[in-house]
Amino acid sequence: MRSSIAPTAPAACSSKRWYPSVCEPDVRNQKNWGHPITPCA
């Protein structure tokens, strides 16, 4: 599970430390990661 690169969108829900904005609507994080905000299913 540990990787230097961020996981894909589905895996991001279990790895909020890589993609905080995927499960958390934080515009600041979205801007930093450079990906759209999506709700965690």
Swiss-Prot record:
Domain of life: Bacteria
Protein name: Uncharacterized protein TP_0583
Biological source species: Treponema pallidum (strain Nichols)
